[in-house]
């Protein structure tokens, strides 16, 4: 079975807070949305090993930047159980990618990845921790759990990355006071702060934001 990658855009906000750049040439940033490279669950949704990395096709694009970031829509975890979906469900999805795919993300040029989304907890806290460890091993900055952020110095510029989602297990996009405090504190020690927000309803009926609280599938 031929497996293709689909990188879809989520709501991504990039906030620049500068205190004097180390060089005159601008920092070039590229961002993609949801990244899901195949899943152990259900069976049969992993790429054939002999095909090589599915990211090979986009590597020339994602490598061509000073900073590349995206939203990791699932865990990097070789084992783990889930009770999120019924066994025969056709409208419930859980994603668990092999840990080895962390190397593919690194070779594709990703510097920061958001773990603040509705699929990072599909296989429980152990797989969240394993994903964090896998990204650390591959020197990819990440942000997800409350209070977490990534930090790198690139071309002499100190850069922070923080990600938000409406779920209670992430930096909350609904708690604006805390979000503002987190970003402001990062700005004190960094030249650039990148802010990623994963949220919003999907589908044709959600093309315009309401002037009120938005709900999707029962969630705020």
Identify the residue ranges that each predicted region occupies:
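Intrinsically disordered, low-complexity Ser/Thr/Pro-rich tracts
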Residues: 1, 21-23
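Acidic, metal/ion-coordinating pockets
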Residues: 23-220
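Hydrophobic h-region of N-terminal signal peptides that target proteins for export
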Residues: 12-21
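Bacterial N-terminal signal peptides that target proteins for export
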Residues: 1-8
